[in-house]
Regions:
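Short conserved active-site loop signatures built around small residues
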Residues: 1-13
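Residue-level signal for pocket-adjacent positions within structured domains
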Residues: 10, 27-30, 103
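Fold-independent oxyanion-binding glycine-rich loops
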Residues: 17-18, 61-62, 83-85, 109-111
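Conserved N-terminal alpha-helix of the aminotransferase class I/II PLP-enzyme fold
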Residues: 18-67, 71, 89-96
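Short, surface-exposed connector motifs at secondary-structure boundaries
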Residues: 50-53, 74-79, 99-101
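Conserved PLP-anchoring active-site segment centered on the Schiff-base-forming lysine
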Residues: 72-90, 109
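PLP-dependent aminotransferase-class I/II
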Residues: 95-112
């Protein structure tokens, strides 16, 4: 099923969670929606085009985006500076990963 096949003006939202294989151990472009699906592909391409980027990555929550960025780009010894009153989930994530040696974190009072 493609947008061209049905003449959709707006890309459809694919709600399927699983996809069949073409044969034994021969997956198609998508096999399970948590790894990717046609809807995410369309949105990622659109975001990359809008931002002039080579690609884009979608995550299911803001916290997963923060976790992805900090674990991909920060290495042991790097310093993350964050506001002392940032979202509690972010604070706990930064603090927890810093205690494990993933990077260093400095919480600052931005009012000073």
């Amino acid at each position: 099923m493609t947008t061209k096949q049905y003449g959709c003006v707006v890309p459809p939202i694919h709600l399927s969670s699983t996809y069949n294989f073409t044969g034994f151990n021969e997956p198609r472009a998508h096999d399970y929606s948590r790894r990717g699906n046609p809807t995410r592909d369309v949105v990622q391409r659109a975001l990359a085009e809008l931002e002039g980027g080579a690609g884009a990555v979608l995550t299911n929550t803001g916290m997963s985006a923060i976790h992805l960025v900090t674990t991909v780009f920060l290495k042991p010894g790097d310093l993350l500076v964050a506001p002392h009153d940032c979202y509690g989930g972010s604070y706990r994530l930064f603090d927890s990963l810093a205690k494990r040696g993933c990077y260093r974190v400095l919480f600052v009072d931005q009012g000073r």
